[in-house]
Design a protein with these regions (language model features):
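N-terminal periplasmic accessory domains that precede
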Residues: 9-11, 63, 69-94, 198
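Outer-membrane beta-barrel transmembrane strands
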Residues: 189-205, 214-216, 310-339
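Membrane-spanning beta-strands of outer-membrane beta-barrel proteins
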Residues: 34-39, 69, 193, 227-229, ...
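Short acidic/polar hinge/loop motifs at secondary-structure boundaries
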Residues: 13-57
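Transmembrane beta-barrel domains of outer membrane proteins
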Residues: 77-79, 199-203, 212, 233-237, ...
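Repeated loop/turn-to-beta-strand initiation elements of outer-membrane beta-barrel proteins
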Residues: 206-209, 243-246, 339
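Short beta-strands and strand-coil junctions in structured, solvent-facing domains, enriched
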Residues: 1-2, 15-17, 59-64, 81-84, ...
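Surface-exposed loop/interface segments of Gram-negative outer-membrane beta-barrel transport/assembly proteins
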Residues: 21, 83-179, 190, 220-225, ...
């Protein structure tokens, strides 16, 4: 079933179009239940080989392809050698595109981790004041770090006992209370897509040929994500006789994805991390990924066990895929009353 997706038809051949692993957007019990968009048949198409795209809706779509086309049809016609000049021709193209996060939510960096009720008790250093303490303070002040809420003290450079990346616990000395305003943005990078394509065409009075090969390399805006795709295509047409013409097209695509980030509301989702990342957390503190002495066993989650370490998600909880696909079609046109 296609769900609510349109049916994709390439040179008359319907392609499978549902997402590979729809999973659960909310309430997933573990990483395996999260949604992962590995793409569909349309993502296997090489844009360099597309001649035209036509969209069919309603009765015209279902009349041709039945119930599968209830959500419409995207009809793709690939290139051939029909429009080429006589003789042989070779063309080469290359292009690169860059990607960045276009817009960010207006995150608040005025207050840090904690709750409004965290007021220092009489006899402590923070008596009657909002305070922060990563773990119990040296004077017995209770910990305020066991929450993902950011209703704690205002950032005014106060001296609090905070997390120390050196000992992966409470620092031995108080440090200034400051916000790290790029502690989400710095997880992302500039992505790019590089494409190189070569095509060979040939045409005579009785037929035409087009063959192409394209390599695409993508590095996405999150580290350790992206894909490589190699596409090859051959299109040929030959006038066998005055009455008979044969057309043949075949395409092969190899697509390898090194990591597709999971989607949804779960601790193994980058989106989940972005929601609950606190403004007083330096992103660099999470880069070691593992607790010292427990490498590859226990991930470093200094602020909450409910929030996955983003670097573990990206480098260890990978969702790779490798796919080979082929679409071929052959047709013959016979003129009955040919003279």
């Amino acid at each position: 079933a296609n769900g609510n997706n349109a049916l994709v038809v390439v040179d008359g051949v319907p392609l499978s179009s549902p997402m590979t692993n729809p999973g659960m957007a909310y309430g997933a019990g573990d990483a395996a239940e999260l949604s992962v968009d590995y793409g569909n048949g349309f993502s296997d198409l090489n844009p360099e080989d597309i001649e035209s795209i036509q969209v069919l809706k309603g009765a015209s779509a279902t009349a041709l392809y039945g119930s599968r086309a209830a959500n419409g049809v995207i009809m793709v016609t690939t290139k051939s050698g029909a429009g080429a000049k006589k003789g042989l021709g070779v063309s080469y193209s290359a292009h690169v595109s860059m990607d960045n996060v276009m817009r960010w939510p207006d995150y608040q960096y005025e207050f840090g981790q904690g709750q409004a009720k965290n007021i220092g008790a009489e006899g402590t250093a923070y008596a009657g004041q909002h305070y922060y303490s990563y773990g119990a303070g040296p004077d017995g002040t209770p910990s305020t770090s066991g929450t993902s809420s950011a209703f704690g003290p205002r950032f005014e450079g106060q001296m609090f006992y905070q997390y120390s990346p050196e000992n992966q616990g409470r620092a031995d000395a108080a440090t200034p209370w400051v916000a790290y305003k790029d502690n989400r943005k710095d997880l992302f990078q500039t992505g790019y897509t590089l494409t190189n394509s070569v095509a060979l065409t040939g045409k005579s009075d009785r037929g035409n040929l087009r063959a192409s090969i394209t390599h695409t390399k993508n590095e996405w805006i999150l580290p350790n994500t992206g894909f490589q795709r190699v596409s090859a295509m051959v299109s040929a047409a030959q006038q066998i006789s005055r009455a008979l013409r044969v057309n043949f097209k075949t395409s092969y695509t190899y697509r390898k994805i090194n990591n597709t980030p999971a989607l949804g509301y779960n601790s193994n989702s980058i989106a989940y991390f972005l929601i609950f990342q606190n403004p007083n957390v330096n992103l660099d503190w999470l880069r070691p990924m593992w607790r010292t002495g427990q490498e590859n066993v226990k991930q470093l989650q200094p602020y909450s066990s409910f929030i996955g370490n983003p670097y573990v998600i990206l480098y260890e909880s990978e969702n790779p895929s490798e796919k080979h696909s082929n679409v071929s079609s052959i047709s013959a046109n016979l003129r009955i009353n040919s003279k």
